[in-house]
Design a protein with these regions (language model features):
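Aromatic- and Gly/Pro-rich amphipathic surface segment
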Residues: 1-6
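Helix-loop-strand module that forms the ligand-binding subsite of alpha/beta enzymes
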Residues: 7-101
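Glycine-rich phosphate/pyrophosphate-binding loop and the adjoining helix
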Residues: 83, 87-154
């Protein structure tokens, strides 16, 4: 809060804040790591999503600082899709992503788009990998037409 009030963010944090404020669409590309964000991305979020600047007071969810901006998660997993289903060994992937999609992104006002998930890319064939990349490229070409998804409640 002090950095927000005093304008005292470290230059690299201020630069990241300005990037978020300027963008229309933010994409986080990462491997799912211990059912969450990799440490470096979690650390980035902890530093950059600063109280007073990106949320606070009545500025959250539909009244959030980033209202009207869109965000999506693009991630890879270590296991196949079957283990990330409700009742699967690792649980429902959407429940796993909820703390990120709702607790960080939607909380600060972002409209969250459907995540792009590639399951176990190290275990799929070159043809499957290429098909996944092609589908992602095609999706990105039409991303401006996508509607936000409901990220669920706790």
């Amino acid at each position: 809060m002090y950095a927000t009030e005093a304008g005292g963010f470290a230059p690299e944090v201020e630069a990241e804040l300005r990037k978020m404020e300027a963008c229309d669409l933010m994409i986080w590309q990462f491997p799912l790591w211990w059912f969450g964000l990799p440490g470096i991305l979690k650390g980035w979020a902890d530093r950059v999503f600063a109280m007073g600047r990106t949320y606070g007071g009545e500025r959250f969810y539909e009244n959030g600082v980033f209202k009207g901006k869109r965000a999506l998660l693009s991630l890879t997993t270590g296991g196949p899709e079957a283990v990330y289903q409700r009742g699967g060994r690792n649980g429902d992937i959407h429940a796993i992503l909820r703390p990120i999609q709702r607790g960080i992104l939607r909380f600060t006002g972002w409209d969250v788009l459907k995540p792009n998930i590639v399951y176990a890319p190290v275990r799929i064939s070159d043809e499957q990998r290429q098909a996944s990349l092609n589908a992602w490229a095609e999706r990105l070409r039409g991303i401006e037409k996508e509607r936000p998804v409901e990220v669920g409640e706790y």
